[in-house]
Amino acid sequence: MLVIFLGILGLLASQVSSQLVGQLRPTEDPPEEELEYWCAYMESCQFCWDCQDGTCINKIDGSVIYKNEYVKSCLVSRWLDKCMYDLDKGIYHTMNCSQPWSWNPYKYFRKEWKKDEL
């Protein structure tokens, strides 16, 4: 009887832990191993960039831009198969995590940095 009880308890524990794996509470700092995913579909999120002295370097591809309205604070979250970007002020994007698509309402603000421009 004890063996059956422990077996059922183990089964329930494994189901709970597998449900938590797919969840990401709203954060401005997603896990390092997920940066490439989150930045691929909304690259103007601040966590995708290392900004200093008026320029920003992309953490994924190394591209350099001028810091301006393009780089935005973002909250990202995941629940089951829904991934969500929250840009504040009622601007958000929700997609199926397994079928993602790019979305960037700020793409027109992007200004590439050129070495000879100082």
Swiss-Prot record:
Induction (UniProt): Expressed in the early phase of the viral replicative cycle.
Residues carrying a glycan: N96
Keywords, alphabetical: Early protein, Glycoprotein, Host endoplasmic reticulum, Signal
A GO cellular component entry from the record: host cell endoplasmic reticulum lumen
Location(s) in or outside the cell: Host endoplasmic reticulum lumen
Entry-linked PROSITE patterns: ER_TARGET
Role, per record: Plays a role in virus cell tropism, and may be required for efficient virus replication in macrophages.
This protein's name: Protein MGF 110-6L
